[in-house]
């Protein structure tokens, strides 16, 4: 898809109005898996769980910007749901409070399809199913968030739509990830050369394309897909933000909007002076007033 097609997607996006009292957190590329050797989130699962519990307790709205579930490596979404049951309990609480929005990415687009959910109706021992969770939750391609006071808008989308190999050739990339790259990466350390998350050249080209589009269209963009954080310090630098991912070594990243300010956040495992481990939250970008963009 040509980058210009983002205009059509943006124009057809659900619009959400927020204000300077709103609290919003964006996560992307969680890649929740089934707990086997191909599960990229497994090493960080307690960091992620601690983070989302913090955001629920502090009354944030949770927006997941694609690739929340890893449906390229794994076929069975119920196995993913069962492995991440504590996580889904928290997400269910967000959902019940109308504080949950999900956007699909290339790795989890299937869960937005009714046909896929109908094929996955198996239940766990608690009589809960992934199908129940997702069939009552709209999965969006994109969202537009509008700041009530400044009228600044943020176009939120996963980003694979302008990545030829992961959009038009998604069927081929999915096959290679499931049967080739996931195994080579797990056992031999190879990195998938077709993915912007694993290829610096692809990522740089992707970032340049998005930055140029955002500038030309005078809009602010929040994406995932590349797994690499981007946080411009002002409009003069860029208006393209990248959330990063939840599958970095011992680290997950997120973007927060609170009190009319936007920040880039890092969650990691830390040790105190006595050697006790805990999950810590650090601001690594911002906070910067939304009006500055």
Could you describe each region identified by the protein language model?
Residues 1-64, 68-293:
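Extended recognition/assembly regions associated with phosphoester-bond processing machinery
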């Amino acid at each position: 898809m040509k980058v210009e097609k983002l205009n059509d997607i943006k124009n057809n996006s659900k619009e959400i109005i927020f204000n300077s009292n709103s609290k919003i957190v964006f996560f992307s590329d969680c890649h929740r898996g089934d707990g086997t050797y191909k599960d990229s989130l497994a090493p960080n699962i307690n960091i992620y769980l601690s983070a989302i519990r913090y955001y629920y307790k502090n009354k944030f709205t949770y927006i997941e910007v694609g690739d929340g579930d890893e449906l390229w490596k794994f076929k069975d979404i119920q196995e993913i749901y069962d492995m991440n049951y504590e996580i889904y309990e928290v997400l269910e609480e967000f959902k019940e409070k109308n504080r949950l929005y999900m956007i699909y990415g290339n790795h989890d687009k299937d869960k937005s399809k009714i046909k896929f959910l109908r094929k996955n109706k198996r239940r766990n021992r608690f009589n809960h199913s992934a199908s129940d969770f997702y069939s009552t939750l709209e999965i969006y391609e994109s969202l537009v968030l509008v700041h009530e006071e400044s009228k600044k808008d943020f176009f939120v989308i996963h980003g694979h739509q302008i990545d030829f190999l992961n959009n038009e050739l998604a069927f081929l990339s999915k096959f290679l990830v499931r049967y080739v790259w996931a195994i080579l990466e797990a056992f031999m350390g190879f990195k998938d050369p077709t993915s912007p998350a694993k290829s610096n050249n692809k990522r740089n080209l992707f970032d340049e394309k998005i930055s140029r589009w955002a500038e030309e269209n005078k809009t602010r963009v929040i994406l995932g897909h590349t797994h690499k954080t981007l946080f411009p310090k002002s409009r003069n630098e860029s208006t393209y933000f990248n959330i990063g991912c939840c599958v970095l070594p011992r680290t997950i990243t997120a973007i927060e909007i609170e009190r009319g300010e936007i920040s880039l956040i890092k969650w990691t495992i830390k040790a105190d002076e006595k050697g006790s481990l805990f999950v810590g939250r650090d601001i690594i970008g911002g906070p910067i007033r939304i009006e500055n963009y």
